[in-house]
Amino acid sequence: MDKENAADAQPATGQTHNDLFDYDVDLDAILGESSTRSNINAPQTSESRGLGLGLDDEVKVTRKRQPIAKLDEGRLLSQAGIPKLRRSAKQKLKFKGKGHEFSDAARLLNFYQLWLDDLFPRAKFTDGLAMIEKLGHSKRIQTMRREWIDQEKPRQRDDDDEPLQEAEGSHHNETSNAADQPSDRQSNSRQSPHPNDDSNDLFMSDEGNPQYVVDRPEAPEEDDLEALLREQEDEVVDKPDGPEEDDLDALLREQADVAVPQQKTSTAPSMDEDRLRVPVDHLYDCDVTHIRNVIVPSNMME
């Protein structure tokens, strides 16, 4: 030990100083030793382990975070939203009517609560209603609301009015055609020669006459027939039944002139009445036979 300490205590010579500054040899040796140590102490990977044991690679499962559900326009307009509410309301929701207002209101609130709980279970009923009220002010919800209201409006009257208008239009056309048919028939009757009178043309059949062929129109419907009957009745009403006023006045005057001479002739005394009339003064002077002759004619006595 003393010898070693004495060797260490010896002063450094020039050779030792040169060895200190000789870095090339020492650095290469140091770098080689560090690389070998790292290779020896390196941990074995999973691939090397699996190849040695015949096992598959380890499957790493990464759990994705589920998105938080929100009550927005898409959820409210989905099949579980307002469309479901409309369908179930038509099928399940029924009211008793007058005298059961409180029970009907409770049934309605319970119905809405169940629907909102299925749609968005994270929120309470009052909070969900507040959120739906805010969403109701958006343009998309308002347009859908108008469409739903229009769908619920009754359209039976409009659907019934369209066939009525079509029927009225067809009826007007048929009546106009029916009104034009008599004029066409008259023009055809004037143009075609007939040996018979016009009065007999309505009742004579023209099947045997090949020169005179008339297109017979089809039988009109009930509405057209009624219209034609009304037109004929109007024509009959317009025609006067009796003579005109001038002819009537003339007839009345003639009857009055005939009645006046009859009255005159009836007021004139007849010969028999003259004979029966005997003055009262001569009754006392005349004889009974004379009175008998005056009262009873001679021919009656015979």
Swiss-Prot record:
Disulfide bonds: none annotated. Pfam families: Swi3. Component of the fork protection complex (FPC) consisting of tof1 and csm3. GO terms for molecular function: DNA binding. Keywords: Cell cycle, DNA damage, DNA repair, DNA replication inhibitor, Meiosis, Nucleus. Residues 146-158, 231-242 have a biased composition (Basic and acidic residues). This is Chromosome segregation in meiosis protein 3. Belongs to the CSM3 family. GO terms for biological process: DNA repair; DNA replication checkpoint signaling; meiotic cell cycle; replication fork arrest; replication fork processing. InterPro entries: Csm3 (IPR012923), TIPIN/Csm3/Swi3 (IPR040038). It is found in: Nucleus. Residues 1-20, 34-53, 146-215, 231-274 are annotated as: Disordered. Residues 34-48, 175-194 have a biased composition (Polar residues). The gene is csm3. GO terms for cellular component: replication fork protection complex. Forms a fork protection complex (FPC) with tof1 and which is required for chromosome segregation during meiosis and DNA damage repair. FPC coordinates leading and lagging strand synthesis and moves with the replication fork. FPC stabilizes replication forks in a configuration that is recognized by replication checkpoint sensors. The keyword DNA damage applies. It comes from Aspergillus terreus (strain NIH 2624 / FGSC A1156).
